[in-house]
């Protein structure tokens, strides 16, 4: 099966880099799924986005991202964000508490982490 190279980079670290068969996330224009040989585009991610990376023969990666941008070429997807956490790094209780915050930015970050954990649609 064809693959595309995916890089997810936060301000302080490269979170993940590798090959994937499909990438899904939410942009300000709506949900998007990216397969190899997708048309080139640049899009802004919503503040409470979750990125799902499907890999052949491996479990999907679920990553909470705090805003940022998505760049797509025929061979690669690059996601540049302020902050990001892999599903395995997320504290569910802290994410739930943040999602209930009166501060919209904190609440969005909490929702993104809950989405990555599969606890919010």
From Swiss-Prot:
GO terms for cellular component: plasma membrane; proton-transporting ATP synthase complex. It comes from the Bacteria. InterPro entries: ATP_synth_F1_dsu/esu, ATP_synth_F1_dsu/esu_N, ATPsynth_dsu/esu_N. SUPFAM superfamilies: Epsilon subunit of F1F0-ATP synthase N-terminal domain. It is found in: Cell membrane. CDD domains: F1-ATPase_delta (cd12152). Keywords: ATP synthesis, Cell membrane, CF(1), Hydrogen ion transport, Ion transport, Membrane, Transport. Its main location: membrane. The keyword Signal does not apply. It is a peripheral membrane protein. GO terms for molecular function: ATP binding; proton-transporting ATP synthase activity, rotational mechanism. F-type ATPases have 2 components, CF(1) - the catalytic core - and CF(0) - the membrane proton channel. CF(1) has five subunits: alpha(3), beta(3), gamma(1), delta(1), epsilon(1). CF(0) has three main subunits: a, b and c. HAMAP family: ATP_synth_epsil_bac. Belongs to the ATPase epsilon chain family. Produces ATP from ADP in the presence of a proton gradient across the membrane. NCBIfam families: ATP_synt_epsi, PRK13442.1. This is ATP synthase epsilon chain. It comes from Mycolicibacterium vanbaalenii (strain DSM 7251 / JCM 13017 / BCRC 16820 / KCTC 9966 / NRRL B-24157 / PYR-1). The gene is atpC.
């Amino acid at each position: 099966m064809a693959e595309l190279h995916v890089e997810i980079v936060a301000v302080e670290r490269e979170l993940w880099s590798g090959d994937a068969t499909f990438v899904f996330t939410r942009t300000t224009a709506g949900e998007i799924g990216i397969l190899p040989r997708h048309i080139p585009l640049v899009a802004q991610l919503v503040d409470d986005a979750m990125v799902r990376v499907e890999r052949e023969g491996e479990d999907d990666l679920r990553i909470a991202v705090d805003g940022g941008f998505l760049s797509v070429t025929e061979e690669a997807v690059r996601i540049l964000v302020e902050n990001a956490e892999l599903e395995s790094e997320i504290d569910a209780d802290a994410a739930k508490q943040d999602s209930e915050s009166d501060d919209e930015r904190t609440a969005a970050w909490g929702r993104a982490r809950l989405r990555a954990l599969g606890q919010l649609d």
